[in-house]
C-alpha cells in the first residue's frame, strides 16, 4: 500500500527542505510541488554538483522519479524552461519525467512589473521584501477570476482576447497609479505562444496522474515551498507570501483528497531565520563579530537562494514552532543546520512571550500582535565538539542531544530526522516517514 508524505517548512522558509526532499525521494516514485512559484529556492548538493531549483521539484535529480507541478503553483513558463535547460546541461533527463497541471495560473511580465512598482512605492516600514517575481499579483488575478492559466495557451485566439482585457487593466494601474511604463501586448503574446509550443508535451492532468500512481501503490512526496509563518492565512500577515504554505494546501494544490496524505514532516532549523520585513521576536544582531547572531549568519551562510539578501537570524522559537505544529498536524520534525550552533557557550530557546502584560506560549496571529511580543528565554549549555557530518544520534555531543530533546518536548512533536550537513549521507534518522 502506498504511503504519501508531505514536507513543509515550519518557520519563515529557508529551512533546508530541498535536501530533505531529495533524501526522502529514495523511497518515493513521485515528487509534487503544490504551491508557490519561482520565489522558492531549493539548494541540493549531490557529490560535487550543486543544484539550485525554483520550480522543478527536487526529486528531479533522482533517476526514474516522476515530478509533478500541481495546480496550486503559479507558473512563469519562461523561467521554467530556463531551469529545465540548466538541468539538461548537467545531464539530467527532465522532460520525460516532468508533468505540469493545465490549471496552473500563469505569471506574465505585467505581474512582475506590478510587483516591483508596488514595492518601490511603499515606505521602508511597509515593505514586505517581495522577490519581485510577480507571485502576489498572479494570485490576485487568480482569485479575482481574471487570470490566465496554462490551458489558455493552447487556444491562441481566446488567449489573445483574455490577455488584451487583463493587460488593459494592469497597464492602467502601472501608468496612472504607479507612473511606471506600460507592458506591450505583442511582446507578451509572442513570448507566451513561443513558450506554449515547448511546454505543451509536459502538460498533464496531474490530479488524475497522482490518483493513478497512488492506486498503483507508488509512494508520493509532496514538497512545500516557503514556510508556515509566511502562509497567507496563518503567517505574520501582511508580511507573508500570497499562497497557503501549510500541509492542508497539498490536497487543494495538487488535486488529491486529504485521505491520500499520511505523514506530515515539518522542517526547521536549529535556530531561526527570516528574509525581508516583518516581526521576528527572537531576532539577534548579525553584524557584530563574535555575537551568536553573527555566527549563525556567517557559519550558516544565511543568504537567500533567490534574492541573495542577508537573512535575519535569531534563537529557536518554540512558541512559533508550537503554532506551526498544530496548524500542520505535524507527525514528525526534521532539525537542520545543527552544526551552525557548534562552539556557542550557551543557547537560548524562546519558550513564550510577554504580550501586553500577559505571558503566552503560542505565537499570536497577525503581525500587529507579534511585533509587540517580548521573548521569554530558557538557557541551555552549548557544546564544543563538532556535529557536522555526524550520522548517528549517539555520536552527537551530550549537550547537543539535550538541546534536541528539549526542542522535541517544547514543540510537542517527535524529532524524526536531524540533518548535520548538506550531503545526502550527513543525516541522522530516528524515524523514517515512509516506514
Curated annotation (Swiss-Prot):
Lineage per the UniProt record: Bacteria, Pseudomonadati, Pseudomonadota, Betaproteobacteria, Rhodocyclales
Binding residues annotated for substrate, in chain numbering: 305-311
Superkingdom of source: Bacteria
PANTHER family: ADENYLOSUCCINATE SYNTHETASE (PTHR11846:SF0)
Protein family per UniProt: Belongs to the adenylosuccinate synthetase family.
Enzymatic class: ligase
Primary localization: cytoplasm
Catalytic activity: IMP + L-aspartate + GTP = N(6)-(1,2-dicarboxyethyl)-AMP + GDP + phosphate + 2 H(+)
Protein name as catalogued: Adenylosuccinate synthetase
Cofactor: Mg(2+)
A cellular component annotation (GO) from this entry: cytoplasm
One Pfam family hit: Adenylsucc_synt
Transmembrane residue ranges: none
Cofactor binding note from Swiss-Prot or TrEMBL: Binds 1 Mg(2+) ion per subunit.
Catalytic-site annotation from UniProt: 14, 42
GTP-binding recorded as keyword: yes
GO MF entry, a single one: magnesium ion binding
Pathway stated in the Swiss-Prot or TrEMBL entry: Purine metabolism; AMP biosynthesis via de novo pathway; AMP from IMP: step 1/2
Described purpose of this protein according to its UniProt entry: Plays an important role in the de novo pathway of purine nucleotide biosynthesis. Catalyzes the first committed step in the biosynthesis of AMP from IMP.
Binding, IMP: 14-17, 39-42, 131, 145, 226, 241, 309
Amino acid at each position: 500500500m502506498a504511503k504519501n508524505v508531505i514536507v513543509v517548512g515550519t518557520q519563515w522558509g529557508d529551512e533546508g527542505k530541498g535536501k530533505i526532499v531529495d533524501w526522502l525521494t529514495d523511497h518515493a516514485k513521485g515528487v509534487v510541488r503544490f504551491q508557490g512559484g519561482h520565489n522558492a529556492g531549493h539548494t541540493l548538493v549531490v557529490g560535487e554538483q550543486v543544484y539550485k531549483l525554483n520550480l522543478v521539484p527536487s526529486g528531479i535529480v533522482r533517476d526514474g522519479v516522476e515530478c509533478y507541478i500541481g495546480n496550486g503553483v503559479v507558473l512563469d513558463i519562461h523561467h521554467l524552461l530556463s531551469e529545465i535547460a540548466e538541468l539538461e546541461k548537467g545531464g539530467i533527463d527532465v522532460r520525460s519525467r516532468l508533468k505540469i497541471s493545465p490549471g496552473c495560473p500563469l505569471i506574465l511580465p505585467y505581474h512582475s512589473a506590478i510587483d516591483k512598482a508596488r514595492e518601490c512605492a511603499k515606505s521602508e516600514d511597509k515593505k514586505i521584501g517581495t522577490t519581485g517575481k510577480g507571485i502576489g499579483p498572479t494570485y490576485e488575478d487568480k482569485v479575482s477570476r481574471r487570470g490566465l492559466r496554462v490551458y489558455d495557451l493552447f487556444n491562441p485566439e481566446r488567449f489573445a482576447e483574455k490577455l488584451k482585457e487583463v493587460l488593459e487593466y494592469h497597464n492602467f494601474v502601472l501608468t496612472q497609479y504607479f507612473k511606471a511604463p506600460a507592458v506591450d501586448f505583442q511582446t507578451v503574446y509572442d513570448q507566451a505562444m513561443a513558450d506554449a509550443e515547448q511546454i505543451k508535451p509536459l502538460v498533464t492532468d496531474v490530479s488524475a496522474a497522482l490518483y493513478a500512481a497512488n492506486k498503483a501503490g507508488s509512494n508520493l512526496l509532496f514538497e512545500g515551498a516557503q514556510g508556515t509563518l509566511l502562509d497567507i492565512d496563518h503567517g505574520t500577515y501582511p508580511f507573508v507570501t500570497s499562497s497557503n504554505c501549510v500541509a492542508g494546501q497539498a490536497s487543494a494544490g495538487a488535486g488529491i483528497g486529504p485521505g491520500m496524505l499520511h505523514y506530515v514532516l515539518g522542517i526547521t532549523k536549529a535556530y531561526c531565520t527570516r528574509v525581508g520585513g516583518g516581526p521576528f521576536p527572537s531576532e539577534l544582531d548579525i553584524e557584530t563579530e563574535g555575537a551568536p547572531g553573527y555566527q549563525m549568519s556567517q557559519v550558516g551562510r544565511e543568504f537567500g537562494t533567490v534574492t541573495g539578501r542577508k537573512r535575519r537570524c535569531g534563537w529557536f522559537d518554540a512558541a512559533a514552532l508550537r503554532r506551526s505544529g498544530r496548524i500542520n498536524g505535524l507527525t514528525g520534525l526534521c532539525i537542520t543546520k545543527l552544526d551552525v550552533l557548534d562552539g556557542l557557550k550557551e543557547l537560548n530557546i524562546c519558550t513564550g512571550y510577554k504580550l501586553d502584560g500577559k505571558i503566552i506560549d503560542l505565537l499570536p496571529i497577525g503581525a500587529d500582535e507579534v511585533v509587540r511580543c517580548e521573548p521569554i528565554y530558557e538557557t541551555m549549555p552549548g557544546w564544543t565538539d563538532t556535529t557536522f557530518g555526524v550520522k548517528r544520534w549517539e555520536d552527537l555531543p551530550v549537550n547537543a542531544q539535550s538541546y534536541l530533546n528539549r526542542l522535541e518536548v517544547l514543540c510537542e512533536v517527535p524529532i524524526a530526522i536531524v540533518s548535520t550537513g548538506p550531503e545526502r549521507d550527513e543525516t541522522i534518522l530516528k524515524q523514517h516517514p515512509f516506514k
